[in-house]
């Protein structure tokens, strides 16, 4: 149930929504509803959508960073690479854990972190 003033839904852009959908469906098992010029996703921990745009989300240009949690960060890194992602910031330590950043096939930047 939605909670007052809590993040309820997230949307991000993609110049190639089909490539973004294929990546997240195959790598993480997300489910999608396809609409004209819009994809709604479920099964990601937070529901959201992908809309067509020439813009992509990158940390270097001030975009928000969506960070996934992993029980096995090395396995997650291999998984995203196997499904076409590019590692743009190799795994590094920070207080509380480790993380890496990757670009999915359509160009958006994400990260995966672990406390293990």
Q: Which positions does each model-derived feature cover?
A:
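N-terminal beta-strand motif that seeds the catalytic metal site of vicinal oxygen chelate
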Residues: 1-19, 47, 64-66, 116
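Hydrophobic pocket/interface hotspot
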Residues: 10, 20, 24, 76, ...
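Amphipathic alpha-helical segments
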Residues: 16-31
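Conserved short beta-strand elements that form part of the metal-binding/catalytic scaffold
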Residues: 29-63, 109-115
